[in-house]
Amino acid sequence: MINKMIKEKMVQKLDYDNIPNFKYIMPNFRNLEYDPDNEYSVPYTWGTVGIIYDETMIDIPPEEIDWDILWNEDYLDNILMFDNPRDAFAIAEIKNGFSLNTEDSDELIKAAEDLKAQKRIVQAYVMDEIFDKMGAGDALIAPYYAGDALTIMDENDSLNFVVPKSGTNLFVDAMCIPTSSKQKEAAEMYINFMCEPDIAYANIDYICYSTPNSAAYDKLDEDVRTNPVSYPDQDFIGEKTTVFVNLSDEANLQMQTLWTEMKSAEDENANTWIMPVFLIACIVFMIAVQVRRYIKSKKDIF
């Protein structure tokens, strides 16, 4: 999104003289693809997309879990799936060994075909509802965001979260200043305040997302810093995660079109049942009418 806002001139460049606390931002969260020189944004939180699942019902070692589990028919009607094309396509793309930023038309078509094949076993396409459904045990498995997964796991101890071994999306929430802002210096001072170690620590401790702030990270309890949900192995992060960048208009249009076709195919499948049921109902109705007429004619005779 930041990359898109930069291209559309929706955000303005930052004056780092007003943001000295940027020095606390870890090197591996600087100069990411969406803002290569950090001219427009300061990282705020980060996390990974992974899989949350009921480990009492899914007896697979965490290190063996990969994205293809979301296509496993053993979990028919117990799988939740993201209800937005970018996240859903990313899962199918990684499953196929593609980049989650691919613009290759054939690769997008292949990802869409996989999503269409998966649809039959998916209980629901949802976003925020994943929290309630997984927390209540209404589903067994779903893709989800690490920070939110930690919150659900506090409420339901049968749940576990794993980052699939083949890789995933690394998301970074960042602070920017809109082009329309008339108080740029004040906004920069606020960003600096949010990067103050004590403030950044208190914020992260409350919202449970991961911090890119080295001083705030050092203040975290040892069990938090070593939790693989919040802070996966850094070698894995470097080798197996990718941030989203803005796709071309053509790729976005193709993805959206394929997504719409995939979702509407669900209705088409439903319609294949409607017509036969309607015809059967008509036949039954006609038979009933004929039977009533026959009975009535007999009564009239006698």
Question: Predicted regions: what is each one?
Answer:
Residues 1-138:
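Extracytoplasmic ligand-binding site segments that recognize negatively charged/polar headgroups
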Residues 1-4, 141-158:
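A ligand-binding cleft/hinge motif common to bilobed small-molecule-binding domains
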Residues 4, 8, 17, 73-74, ...:
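Structured segments of extracytoplasmic/periplasmic soluble domains
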Residues 55, 83, 146, 206-207:
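Short secondary-structure boundary segments
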Residues 108-117, 155-179:
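Periplasmic-binding protein-like
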Residues 178-239:
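Mature extracytoplasmic/periplasmic domains
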Residues 235-302:
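Conserved C-terminal helix/tail region of periplasmic/extracytoplasmic solute-binding proteins
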